[in-house]
Amino acid sequence: MKSASNKLLPALFCLLLVARLQAAEEPKLSPLPAPVSNNAVAISHDQGRARIFSFMGIGPKKTWDAITTSAYEMDPGTGKWTEKRPVPGVAGRLAASAVALHDQVFIFGGYVVDAQSGETTVSDLNVFVPVENRYYRGQDIPVPVDDAVVGLYRDRYIFLIGGWSTSKDDAVSNVQVYDTDKDTWMQATPIPGTPVFGHAGAIIGDTIVYVDGAYKNPSGPNPKYVASSECWMGKIPKKGDITKIEWTKLPAHPGNARYRIAAGAGPLGKKADRIYFSGGTDIPYNYDGIGYNGQPAEPSPVTFAFNDYTGKWETVSEDTPEPTMDHRGLLVTRRGLIVVGGMEKGQQVTAKVTVIKPVSRK
């Protein structure tokens, strides 16, 4: 008579074989065709097919003329990138935001830089139609912003939260809501905390969460901007007027206050819905990675999450391999958390596509 352990061996072998086959079936995600940082990223699941997009950003020189209009699309099924038609405009942009919805990608704002290092926030809303490789213009953003937080609600409304606006010469508290069905804008309840730019966050269910960012130094011009440690949660009404947001201050998240963290929302396997945050730096800086205080910014290795079910912070990793900063988003997929491009240690612009496998612990 066979022992219980012997009976289990075939089943264990089958499980291991299936796991190995699944791993073998998933191709490695190729680096971007060119190194880029501060690029707007999005993921589409139209018709059950995942597609990853990267728009604009800055190249390795980190100068005004290294800002690009380039656009790329990846099929995770092959792990390969395809170059797409460049984003319209006379110049590339930094600090834009992107959201994919159905068969389109909406690209909001950002700023352009001239040869004298002058920066101008743009009001552009460009909508990319991947299957046709074309763009069309949506209704301009009422208050132009860059370095804002963006989130999708009910597969229809896109929230643009805070950010910097050169028209105001400051960060703004506006929460602007774009109706993708009607191509119209609404103004929602402003953020009650310090207006910030370079903050990070997303929407999960009817919950907005954003953290950190930078703001003008109230003590003077040295440094010009300092990091914010504020964390906020906004509740969007399930019924009635979606612009009436109820804001609540959250306790501090794991790790230091940071700037330009990669953030994104979604379920991961059987885990409850979470908003994930990874990388970023505790030194606010301009587009070259050198802090407003004159010190070089370096990426944080901390990855953490907000659990929408418990309403609590979770530490995912205090030592994320090859951490990066200078991000405009993070993509939550069945593979893990995908980070596209960014700046590595030493302010080096990278083409890498990194997959972070989270194992949450409190």
Short names for language-model regions:
Residues 10-20:
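Bacterial N-terminal signal peptides
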